[in-house]
Amino acid sequence: EFSRIQVGEGGLLTAGAGALLSRVVNEALKAELSGLESCVGIPGTVGGAVSMDAGTRREWIGQRVRDVVTLRPGEGLHRYEASEIEWGYRCTSIPTSEIVLEATFQLERGQKQAIAEEMEARLRRRRSSQPMGRPCCGSVFRNPPERSAGILIESCGLKGAMAGGAQISEEHANFIVNTGRASAADVVSLMGRAHDAVRDRFDIDLACEVKLLGFGA
């Protein structure tokens, strides 16, 4: 059951890799468990969030992981303690050949109202600067050291640029939104355009934050 969410004793919460991160955050709130407030508003599933160490510059999901279960091709299940995993900026040391099946988070008891207020405050900040009303895959490039990928792309005049049904968000240029009928190829086309523009103008090679499947490097 890849989408199951189970609240255990001692502040533990276990979620299958297919569970939406938004559901996990809400279940933590219902159980009056604090620690995942920084994940509110982040799209995607637990598997993707753990594999990419989703979060912000100051807080990331790996800080709350107790252990992760993966499937090793040809070997079977393997459990990693959080301390065995190297957590980096939008990456982990979990081999890409392994499939994340579930993760257990260590949370703390809190007051439901305080947790909800913190989540709402964070959601307001995201809504004020990110395209929360349209489908997207989150930010598409990693921020270079001491720079903002969104500001770099915006400085190249690409806010609002389109390819098919995909558009570089007019709210935050490091997001590509689906205006209705965007294909993956449309998104990748815009990513390439933004990458090349930033490289040509600033001599900065933006690294992809999203993982591309079925496309060349």
Set out the residue ranges of the language-model regions:
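Structural signature of FAD isoalloxazine-binding scaffolds in flavoprotein oxidoreductases
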Residues: E1-R4, V50-E81, P95-E102
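Phosphate/pyrophosphate- and phosphate-bearing ligand-binding catalytic cores of soluble enzymes
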Residues: L71-G192, D196-A217
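Short beta-strand or tight-loop elements
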Residues: S34, R64, S83-I85
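Residues embedded in well-ordered beta-strands within globular domains across many folds
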Residues: Q6, E37, V69, V210-K211
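Short glycine/serine/threonine-biased micro-segments
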Residues: G16, C39-V46, D53, C136, ...
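Anion-binding (especially nucleotide phosphate/pyrophosphate-binding) glycine-rich loop
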Residues: E1-V46
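A generic local secondary-structure boundary/capping motif
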Residues: V25-A28, L36-V40, V50-W60, V68, ...
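Gly/Ser/Thr-rich beta-alpha loop segments that engage phosphate groups in nucleotides
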Residues: L20, P43-V50, R57, V140, ...
